[in-house]
Amino acid sequence: MKTIEVDDQIYRYIASRTLHIGESASDILRRLLALPLDTEPTVALGHEANAEQTDEVSTDVLTMLLDNAQLAKEESAIARFMLILSALYRSQPDAFRHAADIKGRKRIYFAEDPQALLDNGKTTKPKPVPETPYWVITNTNTGRKRLIIEQLMQAMGYSADLIAEVCNKV
């Protein structure tokens, strides 16, 4: 296996073409370029192997996000918050769906339509999370945004170290 460097736009394009968790960049490119499949199967073999593979892939997606120049150049905490939420969804859509049930004392954080968020508070300023079916409240301070990310990642099963690293990027 060789390593190549690609710019952020190309990386995002490749990542956005992922069909399933565990699909490698090589598999995606082979599919996009209509090249023959690799002789080694890349399909998940079982539940245990699949869980390990999911952790590895989702950690890779987040690690790439943390190193991403786009995240670093974003001046707004809301923009960084949205990039992180989008990456979390792309890394584990099913886990994100289950974890999106988290809520604060007085309001829900995520919904599939903005009205549900507005029904829980007229000042929530719901915004769509890019590349997901979800909306999130944005009228919160940076500390609350970090708490939302932390609770979401805990519910998704991420390690405490990775959670802390991601939260520090908001």
From Swiss-Prot:
Residues 139-145 are annotated as: Interaction with DNA. Keywords: Cytoplasm, DNA replication inhibitor, DNA-binding. One of its GO terms (biological process) is negative regulation of DNA-templated DNA replication initiation. SUPFAM superfamilies: Replication modulator SeqA, C-terminal DNA-binding domain, Ribbon-helix-helix. InterPro entries: Arc_rbn_hlx_hlx, Ribbon_hlx_hlx, SeqA, SeqA_DNA-bd_C, SeqA_DNA-bd_C_sf, SeqA_N. One of its GO terms (molecular function) is DNA binding. Negative regulator of replication initiation, which contributes to regulation of DNA replication and ensures that replication initiation occurs exactly once per chromosome per cell cycle. Binds to pairs of hemimethylated GATC sequences in the oriC region, thus preventing assembly of replication proteins and re-initiation at newly replicated origins. Repression is relieved when the region becomes fully methylated. Belongs to the SeqA family. This is Negative modulator of initiation of replication. It comes from Tolumonas auensis (strain DSM 9187 / NBRC 110442 / TA 4). The gene is seqA.
